[in-house]
Regions:
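Short aromatic-glycine-(Arg/Gly/Cys) micro-motifs in beta-strand/loop hairpins
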Residues: 1-23
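Extended catalytic/binding region for NAD+/ADP-ribose chemistry, centered on the ART fold
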Residues: 20-44
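Conserved NAD+-utilizing ADP-ribose enzyme module
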Residues: 23-24, 44-156
Length: 156
């Protein structure tokens, strides 16, 4: 499977050292099978006057059963709880790989309203139910990263 990472620089050797804490699926290297999603990730860098660079990887799916994986097929209560734990620094899970929806602008607004206590979980789930997830994959361990092979990059 081909996966993409959007940034301001080429990342030929992904690592976990540069990952940020308290994001959707916790510390890790984030990619997507959706080129358009990676291009959106580049947008914030382009707004700051930097180049947007999409790095491309081949992911060895045949070995995925070697990884402890968590997959979210939709925006759900389970997804929302996981995001809440990761974003608040309370994630203690040991998944190698987490797959699920991106908290894009509309989804992010709903998540923030829930985090701030302005809507309850039921209302948040009702709002998210109709959103089609943009897929992101978080490689959270070196074991998972070993299945990702750099193929090249392009500047937007």
């Amino acid at each position: 499977m081909i996966l993409y990472h959007g940034s301001f620089l080429e990342i030929a050797k992904p690592d976990l050292v540069h990952s940020r804490p308290n994001v959707d699926f916790g510390r890790g290297f984030y990619v997507t099978p959706l080129y358009e999603q990676a291009a959106k990730w580049c947008g914030k860098f382009k707004h700051r006057g930097k180049d947007g660079i999409i790095s491309r990887y081949e992911y060895d799916e045949s070995r995925e059963d070697e990884l402890k994986t968590l997959k979210f097929d939709s925006y759900s209560e389970k997804w929302l709880d996981f995001i809440l734990n990761c974003r608040s620094g309370k994630d203690s899970t040991d998944y190698d790989l987490v797959v699920g929806g991106v908290a894009n602008d509309k989804v992010f607004n709903t998540v923030e309203l829930f985090f701030d206590g302005l809507i309850d979980k039921t209302e948040a789930i009702n709002r998210l139910r109709y959103e089609k997830p943009n897929l992101q994959i978080c490689f959270r361990t070196e074991k998972a990263l070993s299945l990702l092979h750099f193929e090249g990059s392009e500047t937007l």
